[in-house]
Amino acid sequence: LGDVSEASGARWVAQSVSPSPDRFGLFGAPPLSEGYVVLLGDERSKPSPPPSEFLLSVFRRNRAARLVCLSIVLSFVCSLLFWTASKNMGQTVTTPLSLTLEHWEDVQRIASNQSVDVKKRRWVTFCSAEWPTFGVGWPQDGTFNLDIILQVKSKVFSPGPHGHPDQVPYIVTWEAIAYEPPPWVKPFVSPKLSPSPTAPILPSGPSTQPPPRSALYPALTPSIKPRPSKPQVLSDNGGPLIDLLSEDPPPYGGQGLSSSDGDGDREEATSTSEIPAPSPIVSRLRGKRDPPAADSTTSRAFPLRLGGNGQLQYWPFSSSDLYNWKNNNPSFSEDPGKLTALIESVLTTHQPTWDDCQQLLGTLLTGEEKQRVLLEARKAVRGNDGRPTQLPNEVDAAFPLERPDWDYTTQRGRNHLVLYRQLLLAGLQNAGRSPTNLAKVKGITQGPNESPSAFLERLKEAYRRYTPYDPEDPGQETNVSMSFIWQSAPDIGRKLERLEDLKSKTLGDLVREAERIFNKRETPEEREERVRRETEEKEERRRAEEEQKEKERDRRRHREMSKLLATVVSGQRQDRQGGERRRPQLDKDQCAYCKEKGHWAKDCPKKPRGPRGPRPQTSLLTLDD
């Protein structure tokens, strides 16, 4: 310590240190020696500061030190933030259910395209609680696997008490999302595998595998060639079937068109069936069709459709169509006309088979309604003479109750189906007629804003439904016309009753006149203006009457006050006159007239005798005086 003059500090080294003022350490600090800070001083220097003050002085004097420290702090903060974000990202898991909830607006749009409506709470409940209990492998977080979705769908569409009709919109929407995934679903859907060529099958004994069964959607595994010994009308290139609402037997098969070219057609069908094609039913639901043939101008998706090889292919009704028809139309008992028109349109455009007709009736009608329709249809069967027949063999041949052996690929089978559809329509029309009830017809009245034409249609429908009469029959025109007049709106009915030569007017003339009256009705704005004007006029009349009554009361009060004042003034005058001339007191026998005694005034001889003159009139004062 003696080597260093005027040194201070806690610890020192026993080495000679040059007192040169030009020797500095890092950032202007004194030099370091063996890990110890040497604080130098001379006679002019003061004692060295403590270590804490020394470090702060270094930061204040040197910019590089500050930058280095700031960089270290920022690096530490960034590392901490990056580690926290990485940890959070690692803990967040995206599931199909959470993905659909994040894009709920897109899910609702897809559901709207399917003509259904979905709610978020029920969506979560069905996905996480209901469908996992079906035992088909549905996870609680949802899935976009079509195979699992279709198994859940088959459970939902199960007939009878085992079905879940309230879950139909939700599973249909899941199916739509999985079949045509939006951009936010595509990363979570595994791509479809392209079919790979299979090795030729070596000849062997009879195959023990069951014949190939068509699925609802294209399978991801390569399809197996069907055996050429068993041709199928429902070829694979026609598309797989969709699950039906009822467990009816599969469509009946038909023979080939001809035996000569049957083998060639089967070979073509076998070669083309190796490539899985999109389901025609799903294509029909999504509005995407296969490219049409060169000679076709429209795309038709009927149960019986002419295929590319000239053979009719069978496409059943989709469950979505059946669901929409059932829920968007009234029941047969409530409005048989509307449901009959719907079924007639379906029978005309879709050309259904016998199985399709049974499925359609079972979906849209109740059991009792279906039995009534079938009974009426069998009554409409006509014999060879053109009249209704009751022969069981002829009735069963035309309208069988059991599944017939009709081949729709032949002309004879198609003729049977055409006759069956015609009889079914006749049965629907006859079964829709209710017992005669004229009170129901009389209860049909025109609405306030209903046009006469619409009212006439409702009236005719009531005649068809509740009476045995046909409103289109000329013999019933008079009855329909009178009902039209009496049950029209009050303003229209009154004017129709006052028409000249009413008896010669036809129903068409009455409708045209009613339309003219209806169109001349005042608009709501005009009616509002008229009501406002009438209200103002009524208020003015009321005010005028009130003013007149008030004036009358004032005049009456004026007259009464005048009489009262006149009476008061007259009394005051009499009092004043009486005060000036007082009568003297009379004795008992003194005359009031002559003031003599011995007689009274009536016997006074001095009193003049003769007729009494008129009394002087008393003048009345008025308020003007």
Swiss-Prot record:
Membrane topology: Single-pass membrane protein
Source domain of life: Viruses
PTM annotation: Glycosylated by host. Cleaved by host near the middle of the molecule, releasing the c-terminal half containing capsid and nucleoprotein domains op GAG.
This protein's UniProt keywords: Glycoprotein, Host cell membrane, Host membrane, Membrane, Transmembrane, Transmembrane helix
Residue ranges annotated as Extracellular topological domain: 87-625
Biased composition (Basic and acidic residues): 522-553, 573-606
Gene3D superfamilies assigned to the protein according to its UniProt record, in alphabetical order: Gamma-retroviral matrix domain (1.10.150.180), Human Immunodeficiency Virus Type 1 Capsid Protein (1.10.375.10), Zinc finger, CCHC-type (4.10.60.10)
PROSITE patterns in UniProt: ZF_CCHC (PS50158)
Sugar attachment sites: 113, 479
One of the record's GO molecular function terms: nucleic acid binding
Subcellular location: Host cell membrane
Cellular compartments per GO CC: host cell plasma membrane; membrane
Transmembrane region(s): 67-86
Broad class of where this protein is predominantly found: host cell
Region feature Disordered, mapped onto this chain: 195-305, 522-625
Pfam family, one: zf-CCHC
GO biological process: virion assembly
Protein task: Plays a role in viral particle release. Presumably acts by facilitating the fission of the virion bud at the cell surface. May prevent the antiviral activity of murine APOBEC3.
PANTHER family registered for this protein in UniProt: GAG_P30 DOMAIN-CONTAINING PROTEIN
Protein name stated in the entry: Glyco-Gag protein
